[in-house]
Amino acid sequence: MARFPKADLAAAGVMLLCHFFTDQFQFADGKPGDQILDWQYGVTQAFPHTEEEVEVDSHAYSHRWKRNLDFLKAVDTNRASVGQDSPEPRSFTDLLLDDGQDNNTQIEEDTDHNYYISRIYGPSDSASRDLWVNIDQMEKDKVKIHGILSNTHRQAARVNLSFDFPFYGHFLREITVATGGFIYTGEVVHRMLTATQYIAPLMANFDPSVSRNSTVRYFDNGTALVVQWDHVHLQDNYNLGSFTFQATLLMDGRIIFGYKEIPVLVTQISSTNHPVKVGLSDAFVVVHRIQQIPNVRRRTIYEYHRVELQMSKITNISAVEMTPLPTCLQFNRCGPCVSSQIGFNCSWCSKLQRCSSGFDRHRQDWVDSGCPEESKEKMCENTEPVETSSRTTTTVGATTTQFRVLTTTRRAVTSQFPTSLPTEDDTKIALHLKDNGASTDDSAAEKKGGTLHAGLIIGILILVLIVATAILVTVYMYHHPTSAASIFFIERRPSRWPAMKFRRGSGHPAYAEVEPVGEKEGFIVSEQC
């Protein structure tokens, strides 16, 4: 084995480490962040090793759009494509108000963010106090103070929900609470949690470990989850004072940000060592396999939407209420999907049995299954009998177990009737016809297949019996050579069968006849020398 100098090995190791830390996270502009190491979060719980071997790139997806309420009222048609959506005319920094403007305003107008409608309540509005959840008055056994998050910096911990929380149309049962004033909602856990897929009432460089009064606690009553950052301080500017705020996730998908103590303007918080954000974000993950390195996958995270709230409106005794808007994911049938008028270009994919605009967390499945090509047709097959079958089989999909049975059956029906669209209603119709005896050809085929199967088994059994009988007879004759059966087979052994044998050893063909038993006379054929 070739030997390498220790100095070369050390240099190669340093280069690999530098390459790992600088190239592992690639941003939209193609340049690694200057403070990329300072923005990394540690997760307090262990996760599968497959996630540790994954490189995560964070790209801001370019097809983000903003919906205008006045435009939707004037035009009552669905958008044909994402490209027709009007882009945001100005960046978020241009929308910020001047520092000297009065923040004690009444109810703000509803702002449509395409997936959510946000409403900001000022300090003088009673809704700001009504939306604040007083955790101290809740049941003590349900309020949990996270010990690790309350005493560490840049840490995150998983929290299980007792209910299904819809986020951008996807149902979540698990979230990740971070010390930096935000909740991570992604399934792929990495160290760049601040990049995307977050619910951020106030994302900043908070460090609960600098004060004994700082805590991170949460409360789950079965219909809502409240996460509160209580008396937390900024690590790089402790003298600014403590912040107290919370985020409430409701079962119906609403998200409420409540602010009790905000000592300074949020726009004045430094983002040098940690990003400062207020809003929502979601993304989809694309998995790439690296051919040069087996068993290693590279995950690229594309942000497809972001809600950026006006940080200048975040003050003491203020609140933000975000109400979810309908999405394509809520439709489970082709007809309602393609005919929906919700502001998205919803399409139905028969292979996945899913309705989507093409931009959600299932983006990779949508593309790999060829759904973009199928969605161009914008048609549903066999949609007329949908209403007649839905009433008779409405309760079939009531439970998850029964729905799985229908899904399995739907695949079988699809293979038998390739011309029909395998929607949920079509599956129910096919099951109904089969129960009434309409599918006689299928029954005949099943009977024929059963007969062939039984005949094959009988033939194998007969063959086994014949072989076993032959073995037993052979063993018996070997041990009883004078028995009648042995003498019978000896007299009729192959060597005494009349036959013509081919004589070898000469260049001429020659035949010899085997004489019958009892005949002594014969002749000899001589060959020429």
Curated annotation (Swiss-Prot):
Keywords: Glycoprotein, Membrane, Phosphoprotein, Signal, Transmembrane, Transmembrane helix. Expressed in the endothelial cells of the stroma but not in the endothelial cells of normal colonic tissue. Glycans are attached at residues 103, 160. The keyword Transmembrane applies. One of its GO terms (cellular component) is membrane. It comes from the Eukaryota. Residues 80-104 are annotated as: Disordered. It is a single-pass type I membrane protein. The modification Phosphoserine is found at residue 506. Residues 476-529 are cytoplasmic. Residues 1-30 form the signal peptide. It is found in: Membrane. Pfam families: PSI. Residues 327-372 form the PSI domain. The chain crosses the membrane at residues 455-475. Residues 31-454 are extracellular. The keyword Signal applies. InterPro entries: Plexin_repeat, PLXDC, PSI. May play a role in tumor angiogenesis. Interacts with CTTN. Belongs to the plexin family. This is Plexin domain-containing protein 2. It comes from Homo sapiens.
